[in-house]
Every structure is written in C-alpha cells, then in structure tokens.
Amino acid sequence: MTVPSIVLNDGNSIPQLGYGVFKVPPADTQRAVEEALEVGYRHIDTAAIYGNEEGVGAAIAASGIARDDLFITTKLWNDRHDGDEPAAAIAESLAKLALDQVDLYLVHWPTPAADNYVHAWEKMIELRAAGLTRSIGVSNHLVPHLERIVAATGVVPAVNQIELHPAYQQREITDWAAAHDVKIESWGPLGQGKYDLFGAEPVTAAAAAHGKTPAQAVLRWHLQKGFVVFPKSVRRERLEENLDVFDFDLTDTEIAAIDAMDPGDGSGRVSAHPDEVD
C-alpha cells in the first residue's frame, strides 16, 4: 500500500497518513515503529516530550528502508523556546533519532503566557536555513498565534498539527489554513475514545455503504478534507486497518453528514486549550 503525498507550501511533499507515537512507552517504541514500517507506513510523528525518539531512531536504522523514502517529524517542547534553546533541542532530537535532518520540525505548543513563541518561530526559520529540518511548522496554534508569527517574520508555517475529529473540527483554524496554504495535520483523529464516533449514524452509515469499519470511514473523512492524519495503535491488525483507506471515496452527502457532527460550541475538545498550556 502506497500512501499518497500532498505538497506543502515550501514545495516539499508529505505522506497524508502517518504513524504517531504519542503515549507509546519508550520500551515499546522500537518494535511498534518497526511493525508500522513493515505494514507500510513511511511517515512517523514523534516529539521530544514523548521520550521515545531513540526508539524511533532505532526502528529506522533496523528497517533498512532508504532515508529518502521516510518522512520523520519531531517537535520543540515548551521549555526550549528561549535564546538558542531551539538549536540545542533539535540537536538533541537528531542525536536520539540518529539522523542528520528531520523532514518536519514543529513548535509543539505556543505557550502564550511565556510570550516567546514568536522568538521560537524565528529560530525555527534559522534551523531550516541550516539544513537541520526540511520543513517547519507549528502544532496547537490558534489563529491569533498564527497571525502574529506570520506578521513578525513573513514566513507561513507549512503545517499546523491540531486536535481534530468529527466532533471537534476547529473550523476557524482550518479556514485560516486553507486561505494561507497551510496543511492541517489531525491528531486524535478518532476522538481519543471520549466520543462514540463509531456509533454515530453518519459514520456507521458511511462505513456500511462502503464495506468499511467506522474507523476507516472517519479516517477517509479526514483524508478527503485534505488533512494529514495520525491514527495510533500498537496492534498490527489495527495498523493494517488504518492504512486500508485509499480504495474508496465518501460521497459529498456522507461528508456533509459527518461535518454536521460538530456541535460548534467547542465541547468536543479533549486536550487542554492552547492558551492555557505552559
């Protein structure tokens, strides 16, 4: 199974479906990533704060897959925004990953109370210029954060990785991203178990119509919206199921029905609010 890629605003390509290792224990990470690579994943998403970059690196090294065939993302943690900390942080991440360069480096959270995310973004631009990452982006950034970093630097992030699922679609952010050619990456795309997305009528109807599981129907909804998506599992059968989403298309009516699952009041949020994370 070959995962389609989409083109970022800097000209680089990114596989539209990847494997995220959030909450994968460090001791289990190498085997989990090895299995994901065996199944066919080529896009791996980690972060410094996850504590499992070394396992990702070990899996990459053991895989025998050419580096050019992989897309590796990691992230700058909140306490590394000041001074030259971003440069030190990416050096540490690269050492743990046993790589010379990542494909995408993200500012993990804006932490607006510290008021240093503009500086962090300026440093990210320098890291890209130095060849330590091919693309740069952000995660969990709201529209005011995005507008501020773009106004300060003139550089638009390639991606914004945000919590996004049918019950919480963050349309203000996705509309802004579409207007500025920023690709959205969905984390928690299946609702993280807080919502019975798989029992919702629009999802079950779409799944039944195409002979797919509810999870596959939700993932297909993300993909047809143009989002990059990271379903997470450590079970091989689920890894395979999550990858088997490129042989069907939801109808416009099915997409509209899933769109309507968001009540629009923000109640679908599972994670912390970006303005409150420090």
From Swiss-Prot:
Residues covered by region (Disordered): 259-278
EC identifiers of the protein: 1.1.1.346
Binding site for NADP(+): 188-242
Gene Ontology cellular component terms for the protein in this record: cytoplasm
Activity versus pH, per record: Optimum pH is 6.4. Active over a broad pH range.
Application notes: Introduced by genetic manipulation and expressed in Erwinia herbicola by Anderson et al. The resultant organism is able to convert in a single fermentative step D-glucose into 2-keto-L-gulonic acid, a key precursor in the industrial production of L-ascorbic acid (vitamin C). However, the technology still needs some working on and is not used in commercial production at present.
Recorded GO MF terms: aldo-keto reductase (NADPH) activity
Positions annotated to bind substrate: 108
NADP recorded as keyword: yes
InterPro entries to which the protein is assigned, alphabetical: AKR (IPR020471), AKR5C1 (IPR044503), Aldo/ket_reductase_CS (IPR018170), NADP_OxRdtase_dom (IPR023210), NADP_OxRdtase_dom_sf (IPR036812)
SUPFAM superfamilies reported in the protein's UniProt record: NAD(P)-linked oxidoreductase
Primary enzyme class: oxidoreductase
The reaction(s) this protein catalyses: 2-dehydro-L-idonate + NADP(+) = 2,5-didehydro-D-gluconate + NADPH + H(+)
Gene Ontology biological process terms in this record: L-ascorbic acid biosynthetic process
Summary of activators and inhibitors of this protein: Inhibited by Zn(2+), Fe(3+), Cu(2+) and Ni(2+).
Main location: cytoplasm
Keywords per UniProt: Ascorbate biosynthesis, Cytoplasm, NADP, Oxidoreductase
Active site as annotated: 50
Other observations noted: Modeling study indicates that the active site may not be optimized for 2,5-diketo-D-gluconic acid.
Function: Catalyzes the reduction of 2,5-diketo-D-gluconic acid (25DKG) to 2-keto-L-gulonic acid (2KLG). 5-keto-D-fructose and dihydroxyacetone can also serve as substrates. 25DKGR-A exhibits a greater selectivity for the substrate and higher thermal stability than 25DKGR-B.
Family affiliation: Belongs to the aldo/keto reductase family.
Subunit structure, interactors included: Monomer.
Protein name as catalogued: 2,5-diketo-D-gluconic acid reductase A
Organism, as annotated: Corynebacterium sp. (strain ATCC 31090)
Lineage: Bacteria, Bacillati, Actinomycetota, Actinomycetes, Mycobacteriales
